[in-house]
């Protein structure tokens, strides 16, 4: 074999090795970050993990491991004292659990509690359960968790208080506002929306998602919580 042929062959081998190292070795391309939702857990698996009434569970897997989001609701009434009316309270609670493998116990990572109190008026509060979800909108392998809720303390036709929370890892975005009230024969009222300033710098996919959730809930909850 000539000297030039040896040089060409050696150069080709070097390029092949460099390509294999770039692609993660002989096994091909490096594994991509994955996200997927999982089937619901049994009541026995969830025993002792939440207070009150369980409304929804979201089970998923992402680059941080197995995740379990539990949504619950509890009610209590403080008795009337002297000249004060009884005080009703509904507490909305979301809690994220993680575990390293199937044999490990679930460990709480964060809790978000929203106690709503109402004295002498009608109290209503709950989640928009079809807007409670885990997603991977920006395809980075880390789940975004969406919570959307409503509350009302009043005695007439008034707007509900609306809240959207979007959490991804340590980052949290929030939108608050009022439901749009439409009564036949009258001008609509309510419908105000206030965005967390940090939302403006979020990824476009996340901002679009929040807008979509707001459109879905902006008229409030028509029935029981």
Q: Model features per residue range: what roles?
A:
Residues 27-63, 160-163, 167-225:
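Acidic, small-residue rich beta-repeat scaffolds with periodic aromatic anchors
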Residues 49-55, 116-131:
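Repeat-based blade/solenoid architectures
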Residues 13-21:
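Hydrophobic helical h-region of N-terminal Sec-dependent signal peptides
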Residues 108-124, 184-192:
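Surface-exposed loop and turn segments in beta-propeller and other repeat-based domains
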Residues 78-89, 120-125, 152-158:
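Short consensus segments that form the blades of beta-propeller domains
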Residues 23-25:
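C-terminal motif of bacterial Sec signal peptides marking the signal peptidase cleavage site
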Residues 64-73, 138-149:
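Acidic/hydrophobic-patterned starts of short beta strands in beta-sheet-rich repeat architectures
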Residues 1-10:
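N-terminal secretory signal peptides that target proteins for export/translocation
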């Amino acid at each position: 074999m000539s000297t030039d042929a040896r040089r060409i062959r050696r150069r080709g081998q070097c390029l092949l090795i460099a390509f294999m190292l770039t692609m993660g070795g002989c096994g091909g391309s490096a594994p991509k970050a994955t996200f997927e939702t999982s089937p619901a857990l049994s009541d026995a698996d969830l025993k002792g993990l939440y207070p009150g009434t369980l409304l929804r569970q979201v089970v998923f897997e992402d680059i941080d491991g197995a995740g379990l989001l539990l949504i619950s609701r509890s009610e209590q009434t403080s008795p009337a004292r002297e000249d004060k009316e009884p005080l009703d309270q509904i507490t909305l609670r979301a809690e994220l659990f993680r575990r390293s493998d199937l044999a490990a116990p679930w460990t709480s990572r964060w809790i978000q509690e929203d106690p709503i109190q109402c004295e002498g008026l009608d109290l209503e509060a709950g989640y928009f359960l079809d807007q409670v979800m885990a997603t991977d909108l920006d395809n980075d392998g880390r789940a975004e968790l969406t919570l959307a809720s409503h509350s009302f303390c009043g005695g007439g036709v008034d707007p509900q208080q609306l809240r959207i929370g979007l959490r991804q890892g340590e980052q949290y975005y929030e939108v608050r506002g009022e439901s749009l009230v439409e009564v036949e024969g009258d001008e609509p009222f309510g419908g105000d929306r206030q965005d967390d300033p940090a939302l403006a710098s979020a990824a476009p996919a996340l901002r679009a998602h929040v807008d979509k959730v707001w459109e879905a809930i902006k008229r409030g909850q028509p029935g029981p919580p």
